[in-house]
Amino acid sequence: MTETTKTHVILLACGSFNPITKGHIQMFERARDYLHKTGRFIVIGGIVSPVHDSYGKQGLVSSRHRLIMCQLAVQNSDWIRVDPWECYQDTWQTTCSVLEHHRDLMKRVTGCILSNVNTPSMTPVIGQPQNETPQPIYQNSNVATKPTAAKILGKVGESLSRICCVRPPVERFTFVDENANLGTVMRYEEIELRILLLCGSDLLESFCIPGLWNEADMEVIVGDFGIVVVPRDAADTDRIMNHSSILRKYKNNIMVVKDDINHPMSVVSSTKSRLALQHGDGHVVDYLSQPVIDYILKSQLYINASG
């Protein structure tokens, strides 16, 4: 497949990130490597979206702290960014709402094709530049002027870098304004972009708990967007999917990262990290990056069981 015929992917991870761990970052890396090896996808960005403060989970520290820790954790990445939208809303947002927000945002700022996982490329949803009258899809048959793959990828990369890769100094605590004027964007037929939910097998298993998830939301998340699962603790994802009629229905939309490498970070969790911090366990350096540890100690977070 050529670069332009491959599906371009943005991986979106929702969660508490209380705190964000090395395991979370490795989850992104493993998912990207796996998707690239399939030969069908190009991962062009990763988004960390911390949950709103009103989520109500015991021990959840304020979103301001969690956003800063996430920013510190990804500061050396050239493709993963932290998005504050979910935290800045008036109340808690469903995972489905967060996915839809980012899909709509990508339509506005990239102008490229955004497809649902089940939508064939001949019937795409076309992104429109904000505050601009819709124009016909590019149909110029003049080879000399028609966008090349390099031009297409360059334009998409330019737009995404403005919203996905802006890394302001943490102390200023200013994030990119999603409504900022990004200028006129070109529109293309050649690029197909999807936003996939990135999660661990624990979230996948939560889909099987009766009443925990809204079934209509599950249909959209799995049926329209699709999921990339990075298993934890050697979880049996096939068994998990067989316990949910919706997961069985859309099993082809669920990509499970499978590799032969033993990943020690797959057993790292935020809970384990908090316990290590509370008990002064030196193994915390195996769970969290040093900038995150330094911030936690400076802010005196997680020093007791209540967070």
Curated annotation (Swiss-Prot):
Q: How is its activity regulated?
A: Inhibited by P1-(adenosine-5')-P3-(nicotinamide-riboside-5')-triphosphate (Np3AD) and P1-(adenosine-5')-P4-(nicotinamide-riboside-5')-tetraphosphate (Np4AD).
GO terms classed as biological process: axon development; NAD biosynthetic process; negative regulation of cytoplasmic translation; neuron projection maintenance; nucleotide biosynthetic process
Question: Where does this protein reside within or beyond the cell?
Answer: Golgi apparatus membrane; Cytoplasmic vesicle membrane; Cytoplasm; Cell projection, Axon
Tissue specificity remark = Highly expressed in brain, in particular in cerebrum, cerebellum, occipital lobe, frontal lobe, temporal lobe and putamen. Also found in the heart, skeletal muscle, pancreas and islets of Langerhans.
SUPFAM superfamilies (alphabetical): Nucleotidylyl transferase
The record lists NAD(+) as bound by S16, F17, W92, T95, G200, D202, L212, W213, R232
S-palmitoyl cysteine: lipidated positions: C164, C165
| Cofactor binding, per record | Divalent metal cations. Mg(2+) confers the highest activity.
Q: How is it modified after translation?
A: Degraded in response to injured neurite. Degradation is caused by polyubiquitination by MYCBP2 after recognition by FBXO45.
Q: How does it sit in the membrane?
A: Lipid-anchor
- Pathway in which the depicted protein is active: Cofactor biosynthesis; NAD(+) biosynthesis; NAD(+) from nicotinamide D-ribonucleotide: step 1/1; Cofactor biosynthesis; NAD(+) biosynthesis; deamido-NAD(+) from nicotinate D-ribonucleotide: step 1/1
The record's note on quaternary structure and interaction partners says: Monomer.
| Name assigned to this protein | Nicotinamide/nicotinic acid mononucleotide adenylyltransferase 2
Species of provenance: Homo sapiens
